[in-house]
């Protein structure tokens, strides 16, 4: 058995075997994460609907967005007054909050193909290479989030979006890399977008966008903060 395992690793590579093993496991639709991430088109649509309808009052232009902030600031008084479209968005977001609250360990695997890959990345996260295989595993608890992701194409192997994050009070500190999207756009952003690889380094973010307690600064309303310190490589 040991001889067979060694031959398999030599033939296919350890990363490929890791991907095959994950494909054989029962997996969730999405990895457990404390944030709604830039590539979740449906979540962006639903959060925009809830914000426009006045049910949610948080900044939604700095992704990733903390699910805890969404849960804390989601205010629904009378469901009967909602339009069918807004009600559907509300139901989907509530279900996402329940799923993310469960936490625990989850795994995911994906294989993508594209005849004509997109050169420009959008919020939809299109395929920018002809072939891509990726596997990821994550762990989520009350104060800790860990994600390990491996991507392989014909030309590169990446560990982007791998991180460990610790929450302390109203702030979380993350070491590694996460996708960022700063701006209201869907097709692109002039600040930060997924068109470049995520920045590897240290990031500090607010978990809840509560307004200032000062009666003057409180007039600014809910606010967010994201600090990123990292090295942007030439390849980006």
Q: Which residues fall in each region the model found?
A:
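Bacterial N-terminal signal peptides
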Residues: 15-26
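N-terminal periplasmic/intermembrane-space "pro-region" immediately following the signal or transit peptide
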Residues: 30-124
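Short loop/turn motifs that connect adjacent beta-strands in outer-membrane beta-barrel proteins
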Residues: 59-61, 80, 95-106, 140-146, ...
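Transmembrane beta-strands of outer-membrane beta-barrel pores
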Residues: 111-117, 141-143, 150-154, 168-170, ...
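Extracellular loop and loop/strand-boundary signature of outer-membrane beta-barrel proteins
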Residues: 120-123, 187-192, 232-235
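Solvent-exposed loop/turn segments connecting transmembrane beta-strands
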Residues: 124-129, 151-159, 196, 233-236
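Residues on the lipid-exposed face of transmembrane beta-strands in outer-membrane beta-barrel proteins
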Residues: 135-139, 162-168, 175, 202-208
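Signature for the C-terminal beta-barrel architecture of outer-membrane proteins
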Residues: 181, 201-236
């Amino acid at each position: 058995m040991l001889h067979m395992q060694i031959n398999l690793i030599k033939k296919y590579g350890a990363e490929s075997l890791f991907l095959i093993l994950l494909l054989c496991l029962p997996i969730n639709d999405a990895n457990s994460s404390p944030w709604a991430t830039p590539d979740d088109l449906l979540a962006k649509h639903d959060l925009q609907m809830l914000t426009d309808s006045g049910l949610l009052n948080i900044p939604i232009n700095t992704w990733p967005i903390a699910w805890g902030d969404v849960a804390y600031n989601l205010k629904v008084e009378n469901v009967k007054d909602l339009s069918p479209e807004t009600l559907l968005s509300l139901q989907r977001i509530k279900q996402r909050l329940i799923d993310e609250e469960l936490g625990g360990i989850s795994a995911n695997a994906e294989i993508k193909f594209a005849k004509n890959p997109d050169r420009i990345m959008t919020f939809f996260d299109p395929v920018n290479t002809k072939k891509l295989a990726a596997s990821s595993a994550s762990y989520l608890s009350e104060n800790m989030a860990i994600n390990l992701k491996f991507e392989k194409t014909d030309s590169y192997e990446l560990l982007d979006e791998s991180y460990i994050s610790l929450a302390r009070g109203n702030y979380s500190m993350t070491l590694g890399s996460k996708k960022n999207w700063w701006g209201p756009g869907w097709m692109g952003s002039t600040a930060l977008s997924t068109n470049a690889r995520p920045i590897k380094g240290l990031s500090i973010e607010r978990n809840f966008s509560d307004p200032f307690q000062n009666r003057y600064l409180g007039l600014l309303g809910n606010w967010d903060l994201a600090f990123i310190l990292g090295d942007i490589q030439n390849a980006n």
